[in-house]
From Swiss-Prot:
Provenance organism: Mesoplasma florum (strain ATCC 33453 / NBRC 100688 / NCTC 11704 / L1) (Acholeplasma florum)
GO biological process: translation
Assembly and binders: Part of the 30S ribosomal subunit. Contacts proteins S9 and S11.
PROSITE patterns: RIBOSOMAL_S7 (PS00052)
NCBIfam families linked: rpsG_bact
SUPFAM superfamilies, per database record: Ribosomal protein S7
Protein name listed in UniProt: Small ribosomal subunit protein uS7
One cellular component term from this protein's GO annotations in UniProt: small ribosomal subunit
Single GO MF annotation: tRNA binding
Family note: Belongs to the universal ribosomal protein uS7 family.
One Pfam family from the record: Ribosomal_S7
PANTHER family on file: RIBOSOMAL PROTEIN S7
Primary role: One of the primary rRNA binding proteins, it binds directly to 16S rRNA where it nucleates assembly of the head domain of the 30S subunit. Is located at the subunit interface close to the decoding center, probably blocks exit of the E-site tRNA.
Length: 155
């Protein structure tokens, strides 16, 4: 076990939108260390969003993340030979992490041909409270509500 917790590294704001959230999205979408490709995907998706909606893409992206953020999640706790799914509140940092993860995973699962279009459409859907990533948040909240009886097992 390590002696003390590793300190969080602060990400730099991206050069175009000056947003740390966009940098985190780029890092999340990046595969095999190909940052250039990841940046191209994000920025092209933002161009598509601007084209389709006529609004600022960064505002729509922030709104989408806000709509995806979960407030509760389930953690498995083993008590007396039984596993309980205990609902716990989610920290702000983890809310954003989960929102980005779900947004990108559900964008990858979409049926469009290119990742830029998939991502753009998922962001637009999420900003309108639709799409797979928002459904994932709703399902998580429903499960937490169903397991509310085990909330006293929190740690």
């Amino acid at each position: 076990m390590r002696k003390n917790r590793a300190e969080k590294r602060d990400v730099l704001a991206d050069p175009i939108y000056n947003s740390k959230l966009v940098t985190r999205a780029i890092n999340k979408i990046m595969l095999d260390g190909k940052r250039g490709t990841a940046q191209t995907i994000i920025y092209d998706a933002f161009d598509i969003i601007k084209e389709k909606t006529g609004e600022e893409p960064i505002e729509i992206f922030n709104k989408a993340i806000e709509n995806i953020k979960p407030h509760l999640e389930l953690k498995v706790r083993r008590i007396g030979g039984a596993n309980y799914q205990v609902p716990v509140e989610v920290s702000d940092e983890r809310q954003v992490t989960l929102a980005l993860r779900w947004l990108i995973n559900y964008a990858r699962l979409r049926n469009e041909k290119v990742m830029t279009v998939k991502l753009a459409n998922e962001i637009i859907d999420a900003s309108n409270n639709m799409g797979g990533s928002v459904k994932k948040r709703e399902d998580t909240h429903k499960m937490a509500e169903a397991n509310k009886a085990f909330a006293h097992y929190r740690w």
